[in-house]
Amino acid sequence: MEASRWWLLVTVLMAGAHCVALVDQEASDLIHSGPQDSSPGPALPCHKISVSNIDFAFKLYRQLALNAPGENILFFPVSISLALAMLSWGAPVASRTQLLEGLGFTLTVVPEEEIQEGFWDLLIRLRGQGPRLLLTMDQRRFSGLGARANQSLEEAQKHIDEYTEQQTQGKLGAWEKDLGSETTAVLVNHMLLRAEWMKPFDSHATSPKEFFVDEHSAVWVPMMKEKASHRFLHDRELQCSVLRMDHAGNTTTFFIFPNRGKMRHLEDALLPETLIKWDSLLRTRELDFHFPKFSISRTCRLEMLLP
């Protein structure tokens, strides 16, 4: 039976000037810097870390898919990369090298100083706010914890919960992990993205319909309907279809629909170059399609997955 991940939502964030990172979330979005034929801008610090970030994202996705067959996957790779990079900056030399190499960096090619500069540049660029777009990302280190700390672990956890709820506007709720007595520091990382469709669905055309989450199970969902022009292609080699839907605020979502039974084939074949190829081959077509309203929630433990 085919896994329930019938849609593969691969998201790229290209903030400002092609600083690339990957993300999956409730309505995954690709922030796109402009037309394909636009002239390239000057090199930015984040360019030097983009290739490693993309490669890390695909490797982590495959690990998540392998360890949770048939389950939905929701993660923000650049957030994980940034957290590990930030931890490395205060670590001993051996640990710092291990963390950065685990993220896919070759330190003889990209020095530590350039990696640090690139992540700070990316953090600044992955932010946007407007009437129809909100993108925030930040992290905070809570240190001075443990048996000899001035505050109890319960007080520290309360501060972390309050920070998380405030920064994510209550979308993530309280932080669920209990702090152990051996905990001396906590690094909290968050990302919030909300964007409206450029061509909104007609709410009057939405009606309850069945949606199959796998070959044998269906649920009733609010099914949106739209007839509009979107960029679309069918990849015969990877046996999938790709739909690009634009949002307000210069953002875009890529939805990837594998042919029946071909999800694993598609996952194994995905490369950073694949996204670039798709973006150049998409053509505008008049589409008449149904689209379910959906929500995804997922908790992942990464201790055994990260290199």
UniProtKB/Swiss-Prot annotation:
Predominant cellular place of this UniProt entry's protein: secreted
Keywords: Glycoprotein, Protease inhibitor, Secreted, Serine protease inhibitor, Signal
GO molecular function: serine-type endopeptidase inhibitor activity
Glycosylation-annotated residues: N150, N250
First and last residue of the signal peptide: 1-21
Source organism superkingdom: Eukaryota
Gene Ontology cellular-component terms listed: extracellular space
Cross-referenced Pfam families: Serpin
Subcellular location: Secreted
Family, per entry: Belongs to the serpin family.
Protein name: Putative serpin A13
Species whose genome carries this gene: Homo sapiens
Gene: SERPINA13P
